[in-house]
Amino acid sequence: MQTTKESADSKSRFLFTAKGHYRETFKAAKAEFTKVFRKYGIPHQIHTDNGSPFGSVRAIQRFTRLSYWFIELGITPVFSDPAHPEQNGRHERMHRDLKAACAKPSAYDLKAQQRRLNHFVKEYNHVRPHEALDMETPAFVHSFSTRPFPERIPSFDYSSNFKVIKVTQNGSIRWKSYYWVYLTAALKGKYVGAEDLGKGIWKVFYRNVFLGFFNENNIRDKQVSIRLSQNIV
């Protein structure tokens, strides 16, 4: 079954890409965003829905592997509330236009479908004026980001008051040699920082982004890990 993933600039409505594929994966999404970022620069934030590979309602802060890659690039992931696509209304309206033009019905194969998508992107950006843009086209209004895409992930140093811990292959951090706090397998091999708030409460970050709290006083069983909470526990 063919699906399409698009990315667009909220302010100018400029449509960066519309890529057809049979299955949405982290690898495919990362490759497509890399092309976009290399050409147009990186934004300060990205607003998405909660579908894979962008978000997961079961994960801490809804973050996925793709979310953590965005964070490493200095991009803040922002999510619509579950079942509320209207919170990203501009993108949803564009998606409806694209679907009407390219997917009713879809082309006979992915290559032919991509030709349709490419034609839509060109027309949407360069030909079709938008009332919200004073009847200008997105291409006329859009400006490139001043933040270039880094070919290597920038290093990050936690403040000296943080306890820096490597996430294990199963997504946990070892605590006081014997105990475990589960975070997410999406962070395996990466380093998180834990800030001591006193009275056994720790605040956990990945780079400069808050993940959650845990109370070390609640860790009693060496065989059972505890999980982060969004509230102080």
Q: Predicted regions span which residues?
A:
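RNase H-like DDE/DDD metal-dependent nuclease/strand-transfer catalytic core used by mobile genetic elements
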Residues: 1-4, 10-118, 122-123, 214-218
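Short loop/turn microsegments at loop-to-beta-strand junctions
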Residues: 3-5, 199-200
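C-terminal, beta-rich DNA-binding module of retroviral/retroelements integrases
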Residues: 125-233
